[in-house]
A protein has these predicted regions:
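Two-component/phosphorelay signaling modules centered on CheY-like receiver
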Residues: 11-30
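Active-site beta3 strand of CheY-like receiver
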Residues: 45-51
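C-terminal output helix
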Residues: 105-114
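Receiver (REC) domain active-site loop signature in two-component systems and cognate sites
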Residues: 56
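Acidic catalytic/metal-coordinating carboxylates
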Residues: 34-37, 60-63
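Short, conserved "switch-loop" micro-motifs in signal-transduction and mechanochemical regulators
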Residues: 83-84
Length: 121
């Protein structure tokens, strides 16, 4: 079981991810609606894993990943994004993301990616 921070500006997407994660035995310790809040909650809760949208207000997901990765390079971050452009995904991975999931997704994709990240840790 992982302690997970879910970050997405869509309340619906946060709810969907939270449901999938809890149904599969993980603990969602906090939810963020923007990158700035994601960084604050990361510092407060010290999650094992973070799901992070790219396009968010106040601070985008890539900038948040850079800050989080600089503070703790061991935390695993999975980008969950509707942006399927390879250049954007490559930028997120260079910033410190561990993997990515392109929206729309299904529960099995989410869990396969999380299980892969957790088991490689």
């Amino acid at each position: 079981m992982a302690r997970i921070l879910v970050c997405d500006d869509s309340a619906f997407m946060r709810m969907m991810l939270k449901r999938i994660l809890i149904e599969n035995g993980h603990e969602v310790i906090a939810e963020a609606g923007d990158g700035r809040q994601a960084v604050q909650l990361f510092r407060q809760f010290k999650p094992d894993l973070i799901t992070m949208d790219i396009t968010m207000p106040k601070m985008d997901g890539i900038e948040a990943v850079k800050i989080i990765h600089e503070e703790n390079p061991l935390v695993r971050i999975i980008m969950v994004t509707a942006i399927g452009q390879r250049a954007v995904i490559t930028e997120a991975l260079k910033a410190g993301a561990s993997d990515f999931i392109v929206k729309p997704f299904d529960a099995s994709q989410v869990m396969e990616t999380i299980d892969k990240i957790i088991n490689n840790n």
